């Protein structure tokens, strides 16, 4: 969509009453309305007499509902159609109508031709919109260098949107060598002319130090000015600063208000952030269904991150009914836009056959594409896929792939890498390093890592033997649903290792394991019940114990793996 803001708007009178009841009874307003009607009649009469400027002004009045005229795009188009063939302003506005479908069927090719005719007279707004045509390939062959030339000519004519668009080209290095300082300069020129988009973009430069010295306070002021003018991108950026507490006091409620304001203004990214707020319960009551609705609205606005997030909601049934087919379709849309997480999730669909026909080779290709874009989740999934193959080389590659995700703190990768080092799968067997990896994953709450680390402490493999720490780890893993951890904990209660012997507690844990189908749980349950039915045995003398808590001893030992030669 090209720029179509009116270049002449009647300034709002700050004395105009806003209350409709006051409007009815205010003599001052009635006088003002009379003056506007008379002014409109004067312009209409001049237009009918062939005054080119009056014709354009009447069209603008009808297009935007200003100057006392009712908003009527059809009438606006008819007025613009009466402009002279050599009037640049009239040709430009007629192009705007065709470009946006104002009062006429949309025709981008005809709009481009009209911009070309208007630009021949060096009319700055037409030069700018023609630049947009060349930048996007709308009505002409795409040519970024030509777009830059046209934006530059519009900027030299003092047109703020031309300056702003030229800045964008410098910012991204499109059609011209990338130059953040020149980009910021262009934005600053247009911002001085109070163009909200330029104020926002200059704010971005100030927030992140792109082309100017980083200055969050200045960014905040620019965002506020643009947001006050109703620019949704700035409202959203201001919301992010409030959410982060960056330059302002952290205030999630204010962030949500700004996200909602920007979303209602049609900004897809704001819908996405509003969805995250509902999903996480920040600044608003947590509501998965409302989060999904926001993600869907952002996805319908073609915001790529939300396209992937909507797929996740369908895949896991989070806020929406689980639907693998729809999930795969959204992941496909995201992958087509080179979104690495969407590629990974589409790969998972192909690997599992969820929503698509199973195709492991295609899954591998998607994981590798995502990994090439720096997606660690894709790298982890590729490692998991390779581990399921039979050949040793695949297992060696899997172990190599797990190193980076584990190093940056991904608990699943740390756990799986620990399994590799514990079993010697794809790497040299190193029990101590395996225990270290389990430690790191367990500290982040990974239940399988807690279980494996508990076994290390129970058996003394890879670390010092400490049944009390083992019991604590089994308990934490069991609380997260690990049935095997329940049975391992039951064994410690049965034998009185690391905990006080308690056959009733052991019975409860073995019973839960039996219901879950854990191998050996039924035999252990029968054994404990037999022991409970037998006469009580004499209790052994108490042994001295380490008075430190199991968790404290666990943390004391988390100092990295010792050398294993």
How does the language model describe each region?
Residues 46, 82-83, 117-118, 153-154, ...:
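Canonical positions in the second alpha-helix
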Residues 57-64, 69, 91-100, 114, ...:
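Hydrophobic face of amphipathic alpha-helices that form TPR/SEL1-like repeat modules
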Residues 55, 91, 105, 127, ...:
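Canonical tetratricopeptide repeat
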Residues 48-51, 64-66, 85-88, 100-102, ...:
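Short helix-capping/linker turns of helical repeat alpha-solenoids
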Residues 370, 501-519, 526:
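TPR/TPR-like (Sel1-like) alpha-helical repeat modules
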Residues 7, 520-565:
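Terminal, low-structured helical/coil segments at or just beyond the last alpha-helical repeat
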